[in-house]
Amino acid sequence: MAIENYIPDFAVEAVYDLTVPSLQAQGIKAVLVDLDNTLIAWNNPDGTPEMKQWLHDLRDAGIGIIVVSNNTKKRVQRAVEKFGIDYVYWALKPFTFGIDRAMKEFHYDKKEVVMVGDQLMTDIRAAHRAGIRSILVKPLVQHDSIKTQINRTSERRVMRKITEKYGPITYKKGI
C-alpha cells in the first residue's frame, strides 16, 4: 500500500467552499461528489440552504455535478432527485467503476473532473486509481453509519502514516 495513493490534491473544509472561480481556474468542468457526509449529512437527506446555493451556483456556471456513491440506487435516487442531480450508484469505490461510468456517461475527460469526498479509503483512493484530481473534505457530521465507521478505523491508520511522512493534511477554505 503506497501511502501516496491516499493523499488528496486538495483538502477543504466543506464541498461548499469550492467556488465557481476556483473550479474554473483549475479547468474543472464537472465535480464528482460523494453523497453521504460530503454533499449531505448521511442522516439528513434534505440538505442545507448552503448546499442548495452551491448547486445553483455551479449549474449557473455550467459546471456539472454528478454524485458518485457506493450506495444503492434507491438510496441515492431518493437523496438527490429533489435536487435534480445526476448520479452513479454502486460506484464500488475505491475501484474506478463509478468514476469511469460517470465520465463516459456524461462525456467528460479526466483533466476536466475532480472527485470530492470525505474518505481517504474510498473517494481519494478511487480518484488516484482513475487518474483524476481529488479533494478531501471534512465529514459534515461526526457520527458515521456503521459501514463508514469500519472504514474510518483504517483511515485513521493511513492518516497517521501520511502525517508521519508528509505532515498533517491541512484543510483550507478553498482551492
Residue ranges and their predicted role:
Residues A2-V33, N44-P45, P49-I175:
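Asp-based, Mg2+/Mn2+-dependent phosphohydrolase catalytic module
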